[in-house]
């Protein structure tokens, strides 16, 4: 977690130059770098539980959902890639084709992560919303892009008390949208900013992985580091509490 918030771009340099030299008082039983890499996978489950139970935020009635690609190699090296062979898949995003995984995220208007899910690159963006574990403890409005449009998905989430808000396509006749929903769609860039900070600051994506276990630990460490950021992207939302609701 400390590495993802340190500014270092290489874990080996951070461990040898920072931890081994200046943080020995915090880690008296320090091990070699090779042994440290071998021990990483043992903290995957405790780290995931720590994120789920402690670090994630709470739903406030306004949530945003999006997915971002996690490339594991360049497209030219797909056929000779061995580390994630049989696990990673080809997918397509707004930037084109890629080979790797997708990181699905939910956040509130404060920039706090509410939940996350990792899937192969060829999984539809709407698929995680079908899993109860991904949309639990969520209510109110859920803002997404056009990739989440679907009649069955909208009806299913509406029954669960969730209003899915997406941009309208040109062939969607008779669809109306309130002014407040249009304003929320304009603010959907907040989750794009979250994705940007995860990739450029927390380094959730890089192509130097040598095992699938350490790939998962790297993602969990980046998410944990982001949750601990003192300043997160947020939008100013003013809520009006109507006393007429008390009549019902």
PLM-predicted stretches and their roles:
Residues 1-248:
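Short alpha-helical elements
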């Amino acid at each position: 977690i400390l590495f993802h918030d340190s500014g270092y771009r290489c874990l080996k340099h951070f461990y040898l130059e920072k931890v081994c030299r200046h943080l020995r008082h915090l880690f008296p039983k320090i091990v070699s770098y090779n042994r440290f890499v071998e021990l990483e996978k043992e903290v995957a489950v405790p780290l995931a539980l720590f994120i789920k139970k402690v670090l994630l935020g709470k739903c406030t009635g306004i949530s945003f959902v999006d997915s971002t690609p996690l490339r594991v190699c360049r497209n030219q090296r797909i056929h000779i890639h061995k580390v994630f062979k049989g696990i990673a898949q080809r997918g397509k995003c707004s930037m084109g084709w890629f080979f790797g995984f997708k990181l699905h995220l939910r956040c509130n208007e404060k920039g706090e992560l509410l939940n996350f899910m990792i899937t192969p690159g060829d999984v539809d963006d709407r698929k995680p919303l079908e899993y109860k574990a991904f949309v639990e403890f969520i209510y109110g409005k859920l803002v997404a892009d056009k990739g989440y449009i679907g009649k069955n998905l909208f009806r299913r989430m509406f029954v669960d008390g969730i209003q899915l808000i997406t941009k309208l396509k040109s062939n969607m006749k008779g669809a109306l949208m309130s002014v407040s929903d249009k304003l929320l769609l304009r603010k959907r860039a907040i989750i794009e900013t979250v994705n940007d900070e995860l990739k450029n600051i927390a380094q959730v994506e890089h192509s130097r992985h040598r095992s699938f276990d350490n790939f998962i630990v790297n993602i969990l460490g980046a998410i944990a580091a982001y949750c601990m950021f003192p300043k997160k992207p947020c939008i100013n939302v003013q809520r009006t509490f109507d006393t007429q609701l008390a009549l019902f």
